C-alpha cells in the first residue's frame, strides 16, 4: 500500500537524519543538562549551595565554557527552558557558545507526569498541548532536537498494558510533532530501577515497552532515521540482592534492543538511571563489546553520570572552575571511549565517581 500522504519531504528527512547522525558520530554522546529548577535544587542542596537562578547559571556556564575539545566527546546538550535563554558572564547566550563548539542544542519538551486513574500509581506524560508551536519557536531559537521522558515502573501489576500503550502513543505523537518542526525527537521510555526485581524481569519488561514504542512510532509515520532512542540499560532493581556484572547487563540490554529496535534508528543513547559515574561508564563499555550484532551507535545521554564529580569539585566556588571543568571533561572523555568499547578501567576513580546516584521515583 503506497503512502499517499507523506509526512515529511525528502529535504526534511535529510535534515533530520543529518542532525541525528551528527549527535552520535565517532563515539560522541549527549550531556543531559535539562534538570528542572526543583531537581537542580536537590543537587545544589547536597553541596550546600543555595538554589538560585544565578547559582544554576554559574554551574552551567562552567560546563559549557569548557575547552573546545569537548566536541570530540559530546555531540549534543539537552537544555531546560530557563537555560536556553541564559547567558555567560560576558553576555553570550549559552546556546551560541555550544553551537560555536559544534555541539547540537536540544531542549526538554515534556511537562511532567499525570496520574493514570485505575492503575497502581502509574502515569502518563503531559505537554502535547501547544507542542507544535513550542517546537517551531525553539527551532527559530537554534534548537535542533527535543527530548521527552516517559516513566514506567516494575511493581505489582506494573507496568500495565494501559500505561505501556498510553506512554508509547504519547511518545509517538511527540516524535511526529517534533519532526514536522525540524527537530530530531529523542524518544525516552524509561523503565526506572526502583524495586527489587532481577535482571531477567527488567529485560522482559524493557522488551515489551520498546516493542510497543516502535509499533506506535510506525503507526504515527515517524521517520526512524531522524530519531534517537534514550532507553534504560537492562539492570536489576536497586533493591535486588543479587548483583550482576557489566557483561551480564550488556548481554541483557543488547538482547532486548536486538529484539525490538529497528536497524534504521541511527543511535541509542542510554540514560544512566542513578548508576554511579563509574558503573555507567563500565556498563556502556561492556555493551559496546557485547558479541551480538549492533546495527546502531550505542552511546550515552547522561546527566548525573557526567556531572556528579564536577558538581562536587565546584562546591559553589568560582575559584574551583578549573577543577570542575577537568572533572567534567574526564567523564566526557571516558564515556566517549566506552561508546567505542575502548574504555580501560584503572581503578583510580575518585569517591564522587563511584557513589551511587540513585534517587527513588526520580523526576527531572
From Swiss-Prot:
Function: Catalyzes the aldol cleavage of fructose 1,6-biphosphate to form two triosephosphates dihydroxyacetone phosphate and D-glyceraldehyde 3-phosphate in glycolysis as well as the reverse stereospecific aldol addition reaction in gluconeogenesis. In fructolysis, metabolizes fructose 1-phosphate derived from the phosphorylation of dietary fructose by fructokinase into dihydroxyacetone phosphate and D-glyceraldehyde.
Source organism: Oryctolagus cuniculus (Rabbit)
BP-aspect Gene Ontology terms: fructose metabolic process; gluconeogenesis; glycolytic process
Active site residues per record: 188 (proton acceptor), 230 (schiff-base intermediate with dihydroxyacetone-p)
Subunit details: Homotetramer. Interacts with BBS1, BBS2, BBS4 and BBS7. Forms a ternary complex with G6PD and TP53; this interaction is direct.
Residues modified as N-acetylalanine: 2
Compartment(s): Cytoplasm, Cytosol; Cytoplasm, Cytoskeleton, Microtubule organizing center, Centrosome, Centriolar satellite
Protein's recorded name: Fructose-bisphosphate aldolase B
Pathway as given in its UniProt record: Carbohydrate degradation; glycolysis; D-glyceraldehyde 3-phosphate and glycerone phosphate from D-glucose: step 4/4; Carbohydrate biosynthesis; gluconeogenesis; Carbohydrate metabolism; fructose metabolism
Modification sites for N6-succinyllysine: 13, 121, 317
Modified residues (Phosphothreonine): 39, 119
Amino acid at each position: 500500500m503506497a503512502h499517499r500522504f507523506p509526512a515529511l519531504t525528502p529535504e526534511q528527512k535529510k535534515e533530520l537524519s543529518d542532525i541525528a547522525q551528527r549527535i552520535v558520530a565517532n563515539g560522541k554522546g549527549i550531556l543531559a543538562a535539562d534538570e528542572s529548577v526543583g531537581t537542580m535544587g536537590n543537587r545544589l542542596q547536597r553541596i550546600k549551595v543555595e538554589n538560585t537562578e544565578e547559582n544554576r547559571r554559574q554551574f552551567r556556564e562552567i560546563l559549557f565554557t569548557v575547552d573546545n575539545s569537548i566536541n570530540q566527546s559530546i555531540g549534543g546538550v539537552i537544555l531546560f527552558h530557563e537555560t536556553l535563554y541564559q547567558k555567560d558572564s560576558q553576555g553570550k547566550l549559552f546556546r551560541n557558545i555550544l553551537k560555536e563548539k559544534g555541539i547540537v542544542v536540544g531542549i526538554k519538551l515534556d511537562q511532567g507526569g499525570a496520574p493514570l486513574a485505575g492503575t497502581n500509581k502509574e502515569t502518563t506524560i503531559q505537554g502535547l498541548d501547544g507542542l507544535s508551536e513550542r517546537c517551531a519557536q525553539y527551532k527559530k531559537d537554534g534548537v535542533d532536537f527535543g527530548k521527552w521522558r516517559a516513566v514506567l515502573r516494575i511493581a505489582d501489576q506494573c507496568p500495565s498494558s494501559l500505561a505501556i500503550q498510553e506512554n508509547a502513543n504519547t511518545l509517538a505523537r511527540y516524535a511526529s510533532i517534533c519532526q514536522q518542526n525540524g527537530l530530531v525527537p529523542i524518544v525516552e521510555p524509561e523503565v526506572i530501577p526502583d524495586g527489587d526485581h532481577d535482571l531477567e524481569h527488567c529485560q522482559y519488561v524493557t522488551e515489551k515497552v520498546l516493542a510497543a514504542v516502535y509499533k506506535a512510532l510506525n503507526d504515527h509515520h515517524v521517520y526512524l532515521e531522524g530519531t534517537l532512542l534514550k532507553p534504560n540499560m537492562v539492570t536489576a532493581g536497586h533493591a535486588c540482592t543479587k548483583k550482576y556484572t557489566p557483561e551480564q547487563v550488556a548481554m541483557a540490554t543488547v538482547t532486548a534492543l536486538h529484539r525490538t529496535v529497528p536497524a534504521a534508528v541511527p543511535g541509542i543513547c542510554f540514560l544512566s538511571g542513578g548508576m554511579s559515574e563509574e558503573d555507567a561508564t563500565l556498563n556502556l563499555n561492556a555493551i559496546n563489546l557485547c558479541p551480538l550484532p549492533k546495527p546502531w551507535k550505542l552511546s550515552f545521554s547522561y546527566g548525573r553520570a557526567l556531572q556528579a564529580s564536577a558538581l562536587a569539585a565546584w562546591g559553589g566556588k568560582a575559584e574551583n572552575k578549573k577543577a570542575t571543568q577537568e572533572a567534567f571533561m574526564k567523564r566526557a572523555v571516558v564515556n566517549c571511549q566506552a561508546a567505542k568499547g575502548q574504555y580501560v578501567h584503572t581503578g583510580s576513580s575518585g569517591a564522587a565517581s563511584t557513589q551511587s546516584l540513585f534517587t527513588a521515583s526520580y523526576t527531572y
